[in-house]
């Protein structure tokens, strides 16, 4: 969706208010040490695994402040093991099928590139249906901005986890991509929320 997003600019200026075009994303969730961690984990899970990650504003990047990194990873690892993959029409299902064979291949290729570049892959241990296009909910740790999974849109149930020390480092790293659709901020400090909202290059910021 990155390439088509350039086309509207060739059509001339749009009349009226500036438009927002939903043409792809690599949304960042930024998790500070003072955030309610359990609540944040649920938000992160919903943000990336809802609809198999087939959402332009899916929170496919997670920046965790270093002081809580180990705690967050443990909770995230435990939580994704409870996700159920299967028939999307079953009310007990959390993750449905990937939309096509081609998209499944793209997800696999990008995840493998992350592993090849040194990231560590964690996936659910649930059994996948034998028929159809399925990918287990996953997250990658040890990710740096040099990794493809940190900057390319995967459009699947895959989360790239990175760390930061300061708010300045967080928004600089979050902004270091060509997308600007959405972002999320997790903290219990209102002043920090407003600071991050003003610094993040994202059209929509949830906090």
Feature locations, PLM:
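Conserved C-terminal structural/oligomerization subdomain of aldehyde/semialdehyde dehydrogenase
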Residues: 30, 84, 127, 134-207
């Amino acid at each position: 969706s990155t390439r088509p997003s350039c086309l509207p600019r060739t059509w001339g200026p749009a009349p009226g208010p500036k438009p927002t075009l939903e043409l792809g994303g690599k949304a960042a969730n930024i998790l500070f040490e003072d955030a309610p961690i359990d609540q944040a984990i649920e938000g992160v899970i919903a943000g990336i695994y809802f609809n198999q990650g087939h959402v332009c504003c899916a929170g496919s990047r997670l920046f965790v402040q270093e002081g809580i990194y180990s705690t967050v990873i443990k909770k995230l690892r435990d939580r994704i093991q409870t996700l159920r993959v299967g028939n999307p029409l079953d009310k007990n299902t959390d993750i449905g099928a990937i939309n096509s064979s081609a998209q499944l291949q793209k997800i696999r290729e990008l995840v493998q590139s992350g592993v090849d570049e040194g990231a560590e892959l964690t996936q659910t241990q649930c059994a996948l249906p034998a028929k159809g296009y399925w990918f287990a909910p996953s997250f990658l740790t040890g990710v740096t901005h040099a990794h493809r999974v940190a900057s390319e849109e995967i459009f699947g149930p895959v989360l790239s986890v990175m760390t930061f020390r300061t708010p300045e480092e967080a928004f600089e790293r979050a902004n270091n991509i060509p997308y600007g659709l959405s972002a999320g901020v997790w903290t219990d400090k209102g002043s920090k929320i407003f600071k991050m909202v003003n610094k993040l290059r994202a059209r929509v910021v949830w906090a």
